[in-house]
Amino acid sequence: MQKLQLCVYIYLFMLIVAGPVDLNENSEQKENVEKEGLCNACTWRQNTKSSRIEAIKIQILSKLRLETAPNISKDVIRQLLPKAPPLRELIDQYDVQRDDSSDGSLEDDDYHATTETIITMPTESDFLMQVDGKPKCCFFKFSSKIQYNKVVKAQLWIYLRPVETPTTVFVQILRLIKPMKDGTRYTGIRSLKLDMNPGTGIWQSIDVKTVLQNWLKQPESNLGIEIKALDENGHDLAVTFPGPGEDGLNPFLEVKVTDTPKRSRRDFGLDCDEHSTESRCCRYPLTVDFEAFGWDWIIAPKRYKANYCSGECEFVFLQKYPHTHLVHQANPRGSAGPCCTPTKMSPINMLYFNGKEQIIYGKIPAMVVDRCGCS
């Protein structure tokens, strides 16, 4: 009995020494800890966002096989950008990448960009080929992207100057060849007749798929072409060497190539906004603005929704990843633990100038984060 009383006295003495318990103080301490945790999470997300933007810049250059961003000024872009129907349609119909994370659409598994449309502007020929004593338009160089993909369509676009009276125009496309013994320097590719009415000039397209395929098989035969568009009075209406006020009216080739996409599996994950207090691995919104980079060489989109992953991957949340959990249980010290990373990504379409001042319309894989998860 005396022993029990002694224990009670000791307990009471300890309570007196410890003093009264302030519940409000404990609540404030807990609140401060929570605030500190949220602040750390915000800082972590901001660092993750900055790293994601820098990674995107590196990935775009790498996937487009560019060592550095093309150095093309806005003035040069205004001169080179064709004022032509196919390009205007691409730009006008271009929609900022929508958040299509809910669908199960096809996506490309390849690392590098899959090209869909290439717009090639004329350049100076490697050969000094002259017809009638003066250089003739036009010579086109082709990138390896055309050579290693299936060409499904090739159109030559030419601009015809406006006429003052109704007239019939005879359009002729000639392929330049090495001079033959009889003096022949060209052979016909296409010819057509069309009626023009007074008003503005028009763009006319001509199918050149066959000659392009021949050029790709025998590059040495590509010496260029000559374009003629004569009206009834013998005036050449084709813009081959643009004069004053004719910027963007150069002839150009529109080449469409195709590649086969591959199907990938679907996954699910958490979606959060910037004000979310979610600590688990989650997908957060991120808009990449190319104009903010000074990347004027990207024609469209000027910005797109890239998104990024951030959050904790606690082992208590890993019933979905039993293999990772087992590894941690087997070797808790040697395992670095799972990371919050993209588990599904989708491509973006991009219209841009490459280093050779060619306009490319292509698909760049794995540029939009659709799902995040722990792995």
From Swiss-Prot:
PANTHER family: GROWTH_DIFFERENTIATION FACTOR 8, TGF-BETA FAMILY. Homodimer; disulfide-linked. Interacts with WFIKKN2, leading to inhibit its activity. Interacts with FST3. Synthesized as large precursor molecule that undergoes proteolytic cleavage to generate an N-terminal propeptide and a disulfide linked C-terminal dimer, which is the biologically active molecule. The circulating form consists of a latent complex of the C-terminal dimer and other proteins, including its propeptide, which maintain the C-terminal dimer in a latent, inactive state. Ligand activation requires additional cleavage of the prodomain by a tolloid-like metalloproteinase. It comes from Homo sapiens. It is found in: Secreted. Changing residue 312 to Q: Slightly decreased SMAD3 protein signal transduction. This is Growth/differentiation factor 8. GO terms for biological process: cellular response to dexamethasone stimulus; cellular response to hypoxia; muscle cell cellular homeostasis; muscle organ development; myoblast migration involved in skeletal muscle regeneration; negative regulation of insulin receptor signaling pathway; negative regulation of muscle hypertrophy; negative regulation of myoblast differentiation. PROSITE patterns: TGF_BETA_1, TGF_BETA_2. Disulfide bonds join 272-282, 281-340, 309-372, 313-374. Keywords: Cleavage on pair of basic residues, Cytokine, Disulfide bond, Glycoprotein, Growth factor, Heparin-binding, Secreted, Signal. It holds the Pfam family TGFb_propeptide. One of its GO terms (molecular function) is protein serine/threonine kinase activator activity. Residues 1-23 form the signal peptide. Belongs to the TGF-beta family.
